[in-house]
Amino acid sequence: IYQVNWFRRDAERRFLWPGFGENLRVLKWIIERCQGSVGAQETPVGNLPLHGGIDLAGLDVSHEHMRQLTHIEPQDWLSEMDEVASFLHGYGPRVPQALHEERERVSQGLRQQAGG
């Protein structure tokens, strides 16, 4: 499972990624990752493209924009994990224990990344 936020913006509120047909570049990386033909940086929330892992030929996307696009902000993700916990709690005992364990594993990794 991969999650992509096509709508991340910089400090000036400009989109970091050009979108539209260029999204195929990211989808290509995902397919190649699933095939095991490209590497990835492991993070608490999943694998991210390595520097240069997504073909940027012909695009006006700086390395700084790519850094921002792939940046994991632990506190933001920890807030997301709290929301996931509340959501799962609403389903009571019907939620498989493995989902609770995975959420906790991700949260623990994020706390470690945040230095706490």
Model-derived features with residue positions:
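Flexible, glycine-rich loop/tail regions that form catalytic "lids" or insertion modules at the edges
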Residues: 1-116
